[in-house]
Amino acid sequence: MKSMSNHLCIIRYEESMRQNALDLALRAWAPVFPQMKEAVPGFVYNAFYPDGWQTRQNSDLAQVLDDEPETVDVALVDGVMAGWVCTRIHPEDSMGEVYVIAVDPDFQRQGIGRALMEHSQNRALDAGMTMMMVETSDDPGHAPARAAYEAGGYQRWPVARYFKDLRRPPI
């Protein structure tokens, strides 16, 4: 674990940061996906991640960084990328959304995630939004994220998502 100095700054993402941002996110989520895999039906996990979670996440996140770089902010600690956040604005709902947030494992539990969340919320406020949303999964691997969001004042909206394997004959 790296010690967080007083030199935390959050800056706009630049294309030169792309590979670092992708690598950081994969490191951040490496402990999460094995726990998620155990918690969801195999046919669902395999449909979402047929080539492994790293391949899918890398592709999805690369698309975010390439298609909407203006929505991404990066946390630097002493010049080292410690995390990043993508904030989407949904004016039709007067809502900002933390679409992606990732903190390098070396910088977790040092306030980086909280700082990125606050920065994202300020982006939404500056855009005139009146509420903020973040989504995560209910599996054990995402428990730390849920705790952080709840500690930050986010209230859970009970949502249920169901999947059915259509390759199996009906009962």
Predicted regions and their residues:
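Basic/polar N-terminal segments that are highly enriched at the extreme N-terminus
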Residues: M1-H7
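Short acidic/polar active-site loop segments enriched in Thr and Asp
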Residues: T130, Q155
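Conserved active-site tyrosine of GNAT-family acetyltransferases
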Residues: Y149, Y154
